[in-house]
């Protein structure tokens, strides 16, 4: 899924094989996500709704914050980024929500009875209840809450998907150039083309859930 979402801005993923540095960047994100599960964190599909589209097109913003306030979201790659944006940070980072959730769950409070922790814990929640970077949205197949979607970005599904479609149109003419090997079957090209089709469907689904 990395090629169909980022090859419009990242030349490293256009070849027939992904280079080691791309694997390392992806592995760092995956490991952080899975360690979050080991620490008790659930998927937080609402996190990416906290960031506006314009921020995801900012090189300085994405370099600092990534694509979502939570590594537990499925906001794997910045498909909003356009070639002229100069963005190099295309993957998520450990964010505001993650640090807050770990602090809430693991911070030692010097009390004898666990129930004595509740006033402090509840106060921490109330302190940030109106800040979308601290919101939680569970994973759901029904699409009841359009903020909590898998593989989406930003708080504007229509605009984000529009940018995503623009990028797919940029990638399609190069499918053969970027994947073919002389004298061999076009297996990688076929895989990339199918990934593009499924990504198009994902963009449409993100918008449909808002209707």
Task: Briefly describe each language-model feature range.
Residues 1-4:
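Conserved small/polar residues in nucleotide/adenosyl-binding loops
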Residues 6-9:
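A solvent-exposed, charged loop/short amphipathic helix patch at secondary-structure junctions
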Residues 11-31:
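Short pre-active-site segment immediately N-terminal to the catalytic Zn-binding motif
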Residues 29-44:
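Active-site recognition of the HExxH zinc-binding catalytic motif
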Residues 48-211:
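Conserved catalytic/binding loops enriched for acidic/polar residues
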């Amino acid at each position: 899924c990395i090629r169909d979402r980022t090859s419009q801005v990242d030349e490293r993923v256009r070849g027939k094989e992904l280079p080691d540095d791309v694997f390392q960047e992806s592995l760092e994100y995956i490991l952080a996500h899975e360690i979050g599960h080991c620490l008790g964190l659930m998927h937080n599909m609402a996190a990416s709704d906290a960031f506006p589209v314009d921020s995801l097109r900012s090189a300085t913003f994405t370099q600092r914050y990534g694509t979502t306030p939570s590594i537990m979201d499925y906001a794997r790659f910045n498909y909003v980024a356009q070639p002229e944006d100069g963005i190099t940070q295309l993957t998520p980072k450990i964010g505001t929500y993650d640090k807050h959730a770990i602090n809430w769950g693991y911070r030692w409070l010097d009390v004898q009875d666990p129930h004595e922790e509740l006033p402090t814990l509840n106060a921490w929640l109330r302190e940030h209840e109106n800040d979308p970077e601290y919101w939680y949205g569970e994973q759901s197949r029904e699409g009841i809450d359009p903020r909590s979607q898998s593989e989406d970005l930003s708080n504007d599904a229509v605009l984000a998907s529009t940018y995503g479609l623009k990028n797919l149109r940029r990638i399609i003419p190069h499918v053969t150039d970027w994947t073919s090997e002389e004298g061999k079957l076009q297996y990688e090209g076929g895989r990339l083309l199918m990934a593009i089709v499924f990504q198009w469907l994902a963009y449409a689904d993100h918008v449909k859930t808002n209707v």
